[in-house]
């Protein structure tokens, strides 16, 4: 059931209990977790934190802890499946679910006792009505008894005939109801998409409790920015939510201009920015940022000689010396940096890039450290998905979580360096895929497979990294192809996962169009294709459009997917 009063029905309930937090491995979930941890610390709530990267880890962790806890909080996992069916909990177990995955499973919506959904109902949820999908068994058993009073045989016969007609009618009505139910559920469940950021939901709770701090507001901003960076929400949804957070930023960071000089070394200041759509440019060189931002790399077609030439023309149009552009942004001449945003935007317009600036936020820690929200997203994501062998997935999760605190800026800077490697590898892989024609049309969708032995292939074995690569590859392919039909197709991409087990990670990405509603139909399609071919598939990831597949089943799985979507 949906929780309408978060304070009374959620926070005041868990405040006096020991609770277990299951947190998914994505940046928005980490930010929501940080806000909740700060609230729990404030009120001395006892909790245990368990990171989970997929359904298997969630099931294992729940079995391990279910005897010690009655209250479980799930962040960015659990809403889009029948949770009680998967976890088989005791009847006194309560789950509070704060999750962006949509659609919300109907059993979770209509369970009043054990499932409590911490989800904003002003999101466009479109949940089917209870009577359209659930039917009481008593209805079907009614009138099934046959009264044997002392009536005349002719009366009994007439009544029996009436009952037979009535039962036939009821059976037909039930068949019609079941057919209608299947249609309703198919329409409701066929597309996967994302709702309001969980970090924003948790920040609103903190605000309701009058315990919202600037740090919490920053985490909410990073959570929303994570959704935008990963194309999980539409541009309109992003701009709307930026507007909501901007009001809180004004409230928390309201300063008179003459107060600027009195800022202390340890202050934290958040600002609304209309900044450049260039990744990590303030921590990199402008040239590296232009080459490794998917928006500019795709528009310039930087994988080609002609594209490189266009980039040089772009820099010449701005009048920026190559020496300045190729050195660290911090070392550029101050006179050039002053009007840099306007110069880049003006030249970008001439080169057909109308969206070079974007609404975002930045944070200052004291005088020295400044980060854009997207900088923090890329750094945190890279720490979490790090291919470094010096720690487990849990270690990487904790490192990523720690990097969100201002007391651990060294970890954040380390994350920025990892992010640069990941972004370079992404653009190099895209160039390789396009130059060797690895993106092929399979009819109803485009398909690309990274082979074992491809440079940096292990960087893309993790779901978030592969999803981001796929989205950037599709953007670049749409800019490079002259085939109009191919521009409108979705993309399926595969990358090696484990040589030992002979498995691949497969992701499905919806078509790249300006009007895209970011809804993804591949989750259900993958399920049906695997069922019809008995392919050995594991739906372990919380995003249904990401699966693990046995490499030897790949060709029959793809054939089934082609016939299903044709």
UniProtKB/Swiss-Prot annotation:
**Effect of substituting residue 264 to Y:** In MGORS7; uncertain significance
Gene encoding the protein: CDC45
The consequence of residue 68 to R is: In MGORS7; decreased protein level
Q: Tell me the first and last residues of the signal peptide.
A: none
Location within or outside the cell: Nucleus; Chromosome
Q: What does this protein do?
A: Required for initiation of chromosomal DNA replication. Core component of CDC45-MCM-GINS (CMG) helicase, the molecular machine that unwinds template DNA during replication, and around which the replisome is built.
**Protein name per UniProt:** Cell division control protein 45 homolog
Indicate the principal place this protein occupies in or around the cell. nucleus
Sequence positions bearing Phosphotyrosine: 130
Of which family is this protein a member? Belongs to the CDC45 family.
Q: In which tissues is it expressed?
A: Widely expressed, highest levels are found in adult testis and thymus and in fetal liver.
Q: Which UniProt keywords apply?
A: Cell cycle, Chromosome, Disease variant, DNA replication, Dwarfism, Nucleus, Phosphoprotein
PTM Phosphoserine: list the residues. 144, 148
């Amino acid at each position: 059931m949906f929780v309408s009063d978060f304070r009374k029905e959620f926070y005041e309930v868990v405040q006096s209990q020991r609770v277990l937090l299951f947190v998914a491995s994505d940046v928005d979930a980490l930010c929501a977790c940080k806000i909740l941890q700060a609230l729990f610390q404030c009120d001395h709530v006892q909790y245990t934190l368990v990171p989970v990267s997929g359904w298997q880890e969630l099931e294992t962790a729940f079995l391990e802890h279910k005897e010690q806890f009655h209250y479980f909080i799930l962040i960015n996992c659990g809403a889009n499946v029948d949770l009680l069916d998967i976890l088989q909990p005791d009847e006194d177990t309560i789950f509070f679910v704060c999750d962006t995955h949509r659609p919300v499973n109907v059993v979770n919506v209509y369970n009043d006792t054990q499932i409590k959904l911490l989800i904003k109902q002003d999101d466009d949820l479109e949940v089917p009505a209870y009577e359209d999908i659930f039917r009481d068994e008593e209805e079907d058993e009614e009138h099934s008894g046959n009264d044997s009073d002392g009536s005349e045989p002719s009366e009994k016969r007439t009544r029996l005939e009436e009952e037979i007609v009535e039962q036939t009618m009821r059976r037909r009505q039930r068949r019609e109801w079941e057919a209608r139910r299947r249609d309703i559920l198919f329409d409701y469940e066929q597309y996967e998409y994302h709702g309001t950021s969980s970090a924003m939901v948790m920040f609103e709770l903190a605000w309701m409790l009058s315990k919202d701090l600037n740090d919490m507001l920053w985490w909410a901003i990073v959570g929303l920015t994570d959704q935008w960076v990963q194309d999980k929400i539409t541009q309109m949804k992003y701009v709307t939510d930026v507007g909501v957070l901007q009001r809180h930023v004004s409230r928390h960071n309201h300063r008179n201009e003459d107060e600027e000089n009195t800022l202390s070394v340890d202050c934290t200041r958040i600002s609304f920015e209309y900044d450049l759509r260039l990744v990590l440019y303030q921590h990199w060189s402008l040239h590296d940022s232009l080459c490794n931002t998917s928006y500019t790399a795709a528009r310039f077609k930087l994988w080609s000689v002609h594209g490189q030439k266009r980039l040089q023309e772009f820099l010449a149009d701005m009048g920026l010396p190559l020496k300045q552009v190729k050195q660290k942004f911090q070392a550029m001449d101050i006179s050039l940096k002053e009007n840099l945003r306007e110069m880049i935007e003006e030249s970008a317009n001439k080169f057909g890039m109308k969206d070079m600036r974007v609404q975002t936020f930045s944070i200052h820690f004291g005088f020295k450290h400044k980060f854009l929200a997207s900088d923090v997203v890329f750094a945190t994501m890279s720490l979490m998905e790090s291919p470094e062998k010096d720690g487990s997935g849990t270690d990487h999760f904790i490192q990523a979580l720690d990097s969100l605190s201002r007391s651990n800026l060294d970890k954040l800077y380390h994350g920025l360096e990892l992010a640069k490697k990941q972004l370079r590898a992404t653009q190099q892989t895209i160039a390789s895929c396009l130059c060797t024609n690895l993106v092929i049309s399979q009819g109803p969708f485009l398909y690309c497979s990274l082979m074992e032995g491809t440079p940096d292939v292990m960087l893309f074995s993790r779901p978030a990294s592969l999803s981001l690569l796929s989205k950037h590859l599709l953007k670049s392919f749409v800019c490079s192809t002259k085939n109009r039909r191919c521009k409108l197709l979705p993309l399926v991409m595969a990358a090696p996962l484990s040589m030992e087990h002979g498995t691949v990670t497969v992701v499905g990405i919806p078509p790249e169009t300006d009007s895209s509603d970011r809804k993804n139909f591949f989750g259900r399609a993958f399920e049906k294709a695997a069922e019809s071919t008995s392919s050995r598939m594991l739906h372990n990831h919380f995003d249904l459009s990401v699966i693990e597949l046995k490499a030897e089943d790949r060709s029959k799985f793809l054939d089934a997917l082609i016939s299903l979507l044709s």
